[in-house]
Amino acid sequence: MLLRARQSTEQCSRTVGKKIRLVFKFIIKRLGISALVMLTASVILFILTINAGDPLGDLRESTSPNRQNLIDRRIAVMHLNDPWYTRYFAWLGGTSKCFVGACDFGTNFRGQRVNDLLVDAMGSSLRLVFLSTVFAIVLGVFFGVMTAIRQYSGFDYVVTFISFAFFSLPSFVFAVLLKEYGAIKFNDWLEDPTISFATTVLFAAIFALFAQSLVGGSLRRRAYAGAGAFLFALVALVVISSTKWFLSPQLGWGFIIVVSIASAVLFASLFCGLSNRRALACTLGSSALSFLVFLAASGSLWQPTWGLLFVLLLAVILAGAVIGFVFGGYAKRSVVWANVWTACATFLAVFANYMAEYWADYTELVGDRPVATVGAGTPNFQGGEIFWLNVIDTVTHLLLPTISLTLISFASYTRYTRSSMLEVLGQDYIRTARSKGLPERTVITRHAFRNAMIPITTIVATDFANLIGGAVITESIFGWQGMGALFRSGLDAVDPMPVMAFFTVTGTAAIVMNMVADILYAYIDP
């Protein structure tokens, strides 16, 4: 008996060792092929860049008396008298130092270190694109799943139409429209933020139509949902208009309580179902604990640091996870996730509450035109010493470009998720799960959703790789100096160093994220 157990253990160890060797072999093979592709592409891009124009064109047209000295200096800085392959290998030698953590991407035509320019550009692009990518993934996957479940319904047709509209609309057109109506017109409206009764009824009706289509079910159920949503939106808009809420928005701890409880019920229903009373009690307990933690720290939250906010968020997440693990019962894993998302929702409500407290002060500092159209921050901002004013300034500058990038990417995620989900829902094992009497929520969330996410993994990995590349058109329209601006400036000046730095970072990110996607396939695929 012991001999058989030992043989079984040895066989298991050999199997695990073989799998590990195969994984390492796969990674090394992929890295070798990727390095060869990067090397070939870098040669082609370098040649194309240096032949894209005349790097001395602006100086040749200059009327400066020291024009020749400027030309000679640029020739020396850019090594224009050297053959292209000498310049290329000089760049390659500096870039190869990245393997020992000492990257040297050279200097641009002005003599500035490209390393410094690259760090600033990456930080700007990550701020601009990260949130939009996360929002696009979350919203796109959610609406993709919902449209697949409600195939050929009114909700499906509306979301499909909106998705194709955003996908077809050129990004520069959408960005310009956002600047005109989301910033300029909105800032003008803030001078007297009242909403006419006709507009109130129109927006309430649109919200009611959306709510009833999202609820689904029988006509009676959708009618009740639509009527309730209409009344809620109507009352909310009337109150907002009559109190001129946008001039000095107030949320308060009552708002935080409502959001916390609502998120607890929502995530409990999504992950466990409301029939699991134990899970619901755990999420409500996590909600209450999160609220008490933030209430206890409220004195420090008027002038916090990012470190304090991170510690508080981590604390409520860990507390929720412990509650779910200890008291979650047979569905403890699902309860843990429900508690984690509930804690995050409560944190966001607290964050929004403190931003609202400082909104009136911020609008006064920026001349009553809070929504920005250009740049990453207000020049010579007077409220820089106050944490929440800095946060509001960053958010108002991120708002429009984030919306622009989110809605364009949202269309792709919605369509891909819908088609993948429909394919999975037609599989035999889904019919088997339904025939066994499993609830539809369990069939969707535990059996169909995970498999439907396998093709989406590649798109998500590619999008995160594109984070570093930024969004050239969006950056240009909204005046952000990110990776796109770095690439464009190098190309305009026929300067290969910024262009090659852009290529190196984005190419490496693409290789790494595609490899991560391949590894995630093995984890997600059951």
Residue positions per predicted region:
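Hydrophobic alpha-helical transmembrane segments of multipass integral membrane proteins
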Residues: I28, G32, L36, T40, ...
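Alpha-helical transmembrane segments of integral membrane proteins
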Residues: L131, V138-V145, A204-P496, V505-Y523
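Short hydrophobic, aromatic-rich alpha-helical segments embedded in or entering the lipid bilayer
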Residues: N66-C98, F478-S489
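Membrane-spanning helices that line or support transport/gating and their immediate boundary helices
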Residues: R30, I47, N51-D58, V141-M146, ...
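Alpha-helical membrane-interface segments at transmembrane helix boundaries
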Residues: F24-G32, N115-R127, V159-F166, I392, ...
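An internal, D/E-rich "acidic patch" concept
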Residues: V16-V23, H79-V141
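Hydrophobic alpha-helical transmembrane segments of membrane transport/permease proteins
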Residues: M38-T86, I195, Y358-L389
